[in-house]
Amino acid sequence: MASYTVSFIPLTLSNPRIFVSRQNGSPSSSSRIPLTSSLLGKKLLATQPSHRCFVPKLRCLTSASTVLNVPIAQPENGSSDKIPKWSARAIKSLAMGELEARKLKYPSTGTEAILMGILVEGTSTVAKFLRGNGVTLFKVRDETLSLLGKSDMYFFSPEHPPLTEPAQKAIAWAIDEKNKSDVDGELTTAYLLLGVWSQKDSAGRQILEKLGFNEDKAKEVEKSMNEDVDLSFKKQGQ
């Protein structure tokens, strides 16, 4: 099984790009493949925007970056054609998930963090669906702390909390399902949510079940798996 690293380059660089690096165990075998989005093109930026905060006689500049190791079977022909395009919202959801794990001072990024990342991003169709069904960010945070507990106040989360095994499997499931669909378009946040749901013993799945998400709701999400934006308001205006 090959490992793909999704790298989110900080905003401080000029002409930032996102790359997927294939790693087969040795640095010499890695290659860089642009992770593209039809919305923003190949120069897609998925980091949390850098921001400056001004305090009297104090100036600070912060910038966040994210690196995610995504396991997925290597294409038979060795080409990059099997790597699906990711929507900007899906990429941001993963980045926000890692930051949520860091906020909670967790040592790794789990399925519960991916779920929180989807809700933090908040503008995708599936995020709106979750909120409409009572699955909110605050509820997920509370359930996460109830299920996994609080981290030690003196513990410092890694700069890039690694993905847990269930989280890796959830992302691999999303990528594989997108490849199997043979549908043009990007890998959306719906694939990520259903990837979390597919891991039956994961924290993310348990939290979703606790908040009322079930197989019927999962089937509703499946109907719009290839849509990240609700365009129904445009259809009504035509």
Swiss-Prot record:
Q: Where is the transit peptide?
A: 1-64
User: Where in this chain does the record put each Clp R domain?
Assistant: 83-228
Q: Which residues form a coiled coil?
A: none
Annotated keywords? Chloroplast, Plastid, Repeat, Transit peptide
Kindly give the InterPro entries that the UniProt entry links to this protein.
Clp_N_dom_sf, Clp_R_dom, CLPT1/2
Q: What does the entry list under GO cellular component?
A: chloroplast; chloroplast envelope; chloroplast stroma; cytosol; plastid stroma; thylakoid
**Region feature (Repeat 1):** 86-151
Pfam family name, one: Clp_N
Q: Give the protein family.
A: Belongs to the ClpA/ClpB family.
Q: What is known of its domains?
A: The MYFF motif is functionally important for stabilization of the overall ClpPR complex.
Subunit (UniProt): Monomer and homodimer. Binds to the CLP3-6 ring (P-ring). The dimers monomerize before association to the P-ring. Component of the chloroplastic Clp protease core complex which consist of at least 16 proteins: CLPP4 (3 copies), CLPP5 (3 copies), CLPR4 (2 copies), ClpP1 (1 copy), CLPP6 (1 copy), CLPR2 (1 copy), CLPT1 (1 copy), CLPT2 (1 copy) and 3 copies of CLPP3 and/or CLPR1 and/or CLPR3. Interacts with CLPC2 and CLPD. Interacts with CPN21. No interactions with CLPS1.
* Name by which UniProt lists this protein: ATP-dependent Clp protease ATP-binding subunit CLPT1, chloroplastic
